[in-house]
Amino acid sequence: MANQLILLKKDFFTDEQQAVTVADRYPQDVFAEHTHEFCELVMVWRGNGLHVLNERPYRITRGDLFYIRAEDKHSYTSVNDLVLQNIIYCPERLKLNINWQAMIPGFQGAQWHPHWRLGSMGMNQARQVINQLEHESNGRDPLANEMAELLFGQLVMTLKRHRYATDDLPATSRETLLDKLITALANSLECPFALDAFCQQEQCSERVLRQQFRAQTGMTINQYLRQVRICHAQYLLQHSPLMISEISMQCGFEDSNYFSVVFTRETGMTPSQWRHLSNQSD
């Protein structure tokens, strides 16, 4: 694309030896589609927004983790108090003898799965390492770059230890109710979600859980689930031959007319218009 925005190394790294640094987004504003001359890890701490990665939309909130390659196109829209950090790095500058490909999905041709989640325990451990990494990446002493790379190695190992697929929180996990709730919602794309049954199973207060969810994500539980379903519908409309009524069912809407109303309200266009526009841009 002729007018594609490209983020350059020279605007983020202090010199050609620096391999890794941290870019804070407190908060992350709307950001047009772009690629990079470097790679990045994206950690979402709070709030919510729409992250479009290689034309696939993700409704993101606390605990979402992305591995972004240099050539990937992504953007941020519909942000609401979205707080995240980008840990940016240049693969060719890394010197430590670590199996980076085993730690980082998509690293120099490794199998790429971009979207993961971290529970509260993993987030807390990652935050501690990122704070140290940010301090070293801003340092000027002779060993700052080496220390930053050591911490980056510790970070990617920490992330690998604690990350899990968005709909697959390990059964042995000691994560919080909020983590379990977000995983349960990700498993409810096609079927109704019963919050009262979830709270009964977890022996928790429905009112308190609603308050905690809104405080951390900036959305109600129903808003989040609806927007996750709409993101899934957008992807299916663009990348599958399914009929709109079939997509409606796969995204938890038994009534395709109601699905169309909700989809139009959330995206500003009907499902048919979205599919037509997406096919034109391919």
Swiss-Prot record:
The residue range of the signal peptide is: none
Record keyword Transcription present:
yes
Which GO terms label this protein's molecular function in UniProt? DNA-binding transcription factor activity; sequence-specific DNA binding
Cellular localization per UniProt: Cytoplasm
Q: For the HTH araC/xylS-type domain, which residue ranges apply? A: 179-277
Please give the biological process terms from Gene Ontology that the record holds.
positive regulation of DNA-templated transcription; rhamnose metabolic process
Keyword Transcription regulation recorded: yes
The ranges the UniProt entry gives for DNA binding are 196-217, 244-267
Q: What is its main location?
A: cytoplasm
Among Pfam families, the record links this protein to: AraC_binding (PF02311), HTH_18 (PF12833)
Q: Name one GO cellular component term.
A: cytoplasm
InterPro entries recorded: AraC-bd, Homeodomain-like_sf, HTH_AraC, HTH_AraC-typ_CS, RhaR_RhaS-like_N, RmlC-like_jellyroll, RmlC_Cupin_sf, Tscrpt_act_RhaR
> Site (Interaction with sigma-70): which residue positions?
246
Keyword list, A-Z:
Activator, Cytoplasm, DNA-binding, Repeat, Rhamnose metabolism, Transcription, Transcription regulation
Any idea what job this protein has? Activates expression of the rhaSR operon in response to L-rhamnose.
Entries under NCBIfam families matching the protein: PRK13500.1, PRK13501.1, PRK13502.1
Binding partners and assembly: Binds DNA as a dimer.
Q: What is this protein called?
A: HTH-type transcriptional activator RhaR
Q: What taxonomic ancestry is recorded?
A: Bacteria, Pseudomonadati, Pseudomonadota, Gammaproteobacteria, Enterobacterales
